[in-house]
Amino acid sequence: MSAVLDIAEAVAGTLEDYHAEVLFFPEFELRDIEEMKVIVVPLAEEFKPLSRTQHEEILKVQVGFLKRGGEDELPELLRTVEGLGLGFLNQKLAGATCIGVAFNPIYSPEHLRERGQFTSVIELSFKQFR
């Protein structure tokens, strides 16, 4: 199985309290989102040779958070998303270690204003050696 898919499934498993799921084509209607929706998407794999027999792999996944809500809920949602993202840093999953957490966007003002939807995306970078 693909290493980046293994990481995506491990991340979703870690976020099982939020009913996270791995999806390849996430698409939702706001009316279908009652609770926070957490989606994990495999994003990228990068390989760098270290020697003739070993290489480094950088595996990236994105974790999307969607919730119907307004500006009054924003501080709590931001704290939740930041806490979840930072909780992965230095954590080992599926044989790889999380070496980077990026929030992009930490939230989307456009989605909040125009749709009444909180949208946040975390990009997690993992490193492993083979």
Predicted regions and their residues:
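Charged, amphipathic alpha-helical segments and their flanking helix caps
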Residues: M1-L30, L43-R130
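Short, well-ordered secondary-structure micro-motifs within conserved domains or adaptor modules
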Residues: I33-L43
